[in-house]
């Protein structure tokens, strides 16, 4: 399945039953992802921007089947989301982000998958040192620079994204229906 514009994947989510709350969530994660994308572009890191954007939109698709996981911790949505997207004809590499965004510690993940996972943490102001270190390590390798040189730049950037977490959370409050 190919998408002609950014609204197409949102429409697919709605067509398969995504609630307004889930749509708002992926849009807020998308805001964090766009900030990360800009930071990586400023470092001249070459990666698949469209994949990241699609991954962000689809990463929690399984919460359509497990709506309680929109408000409670849980991971049943991960495999369910991947299967649901595959059934809709979504590229398997993109559908995989339903699992990799939550299982990045135990899966071999691409840079793009790690960016989706990181955006899913930072959107709400939550930092994750292990995940950030994985992203920085891959970024340093990709742009052929020293880890610590990249760390200094990206750590500040990650903090900037996280600093907007309270505002993004406040914008999700009105979407209480599952």
Regions found by a protein language model. Give the residues of each.
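Conserved N-terminal diphosphate/IPP-binding helix and adjacent helical/loop segment
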Residues: 1-3, 26
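Generic N-terminal amphipathic, Lys/Arg-enriched alpha-helix
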Residues: 4-19
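A positional/architectural concept
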Residues: 17, 21-41
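Short, well-structured alpha-helical segments
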Residues: 23, 27-30, 49-53, 82, ...
């Amino acid at each position: 399945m190919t998408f002609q514009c950014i609204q197409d994947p949102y429409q697919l989510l709605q067509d398969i039953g995504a609630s307004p709350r889930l749509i708002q969530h992926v849009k807020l994660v998308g805001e964090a992802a766009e900030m990360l994308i800009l930071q990586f572009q400023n470092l001249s890191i070459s990666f698949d921007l469209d994949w990241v954007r699609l991954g962000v939109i689809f990463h929690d698709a399984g919460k359509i089947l497990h709506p309680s996981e929109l408000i409670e911790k849980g991971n049943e949505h991960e495999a369910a989301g991947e299967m649901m997207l595959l059934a809709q004809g979504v590229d398997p590499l993109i559908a995989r982000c339903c699992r990799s965004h939550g299982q990045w510690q135990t899966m071999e993940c691409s840079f793009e998958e790690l960016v989706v996972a990181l955006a899913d943490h930072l959107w709400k102001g939550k930092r994750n040192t292990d995940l950030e270190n994985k992203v920085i390590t891959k970024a340093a390798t990709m742009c052929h620079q020293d880890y610590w040189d990249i760390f200094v730049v990206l750590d500040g950037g990650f903090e900037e994204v996280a600093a907007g977490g309270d505002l993004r959370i406040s914008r999700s409050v009105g979407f209480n229906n599952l």
